[in-house]
Amino acid sequence: MREQIKQDIDLIEILFYLKKKIRVILFIMAICMAMVLLFLYINKDNIKVIYSLKINQTTPGILVSCDSNNNFACQTTMTEDVIQRITTFFHTSPDVKNREIRLEWSGDKRALPTAEEEISRVQASIIKWYASEYHNGRQVLDEIQTPSAINSELYTKMIYLTRNWSLYPNGDGCVTISSPEIKNKYPAAICLALGFFLSIVISVMFCLVKKMVDEYQQNSGQ
């Protein structure tokens, strides 16, 4: 009980001490917030651009290579390999919920035209890859002669896929890339809120540490 009372008294003393140091606290907070504002000003042109790539049609190669139970993950890996062979401009990641591949880029907004050029290259390369996959798939089907292979489920699926290729002339439409989602790399609201919280912590800790140092020096002097 006495120890609890002592802790309460210590807490009240600390609060009174901080109240006396309110000017110091406000001054440190002002410096911290000024640094946050400077940071936001320096990085005002930094943006994050996100594209979403949706695969509308599988390919014979994906059908052969990927397990149907984990088709999206395998399909994503193969598509990402194609993208990374073309460009390292984007960071790719699977969006399992929406069954899409996210392509992200961060940088100065003046480089946005470069990002648009790169995404066009990505789309053209994937379409070319799809066309090549279907061409190779048809060749494989033409070469298959054994009855067991012809009567297999995989053969039937590949026949279905290659015939459906007419729905995507020259590969157009086999993938869809969304319009870019553009936002600030460092959102002002989040940075200001985080900066305000940290400024309070830093200023209070500064005052408490200074109080401990002063008390230690006084005790050492005595």
Swiss-Prot record:
<feature type="transmembrane region" description="Helical">
    <location>
        <begin position="22"/>
        <end position="42"/>
    </location>
</feature>
<keyword id="KW-1133">Transmembrane helix</keyword>
<keyword id="KW-0812">Transmembrane</keyword>
<keyword id="KW-1003">Cell membrane</keyword>
<feature type="transmembrane region" description="Helical">
    <location>
        <begin position="189"/>
        <end position="209"/>
    </location>
</feature>
<keyword id="KW-0472">Membrane</keyword>
<dbReference type="GO" id="GO:0005886">
    <property type="term" value="C:plasma membrane"/>
</dbReference>
<protein>
    <recommendedName>
        <fullName>Uncharacterized protein YkgH</fullName>
    </recommendedName>
</protein>
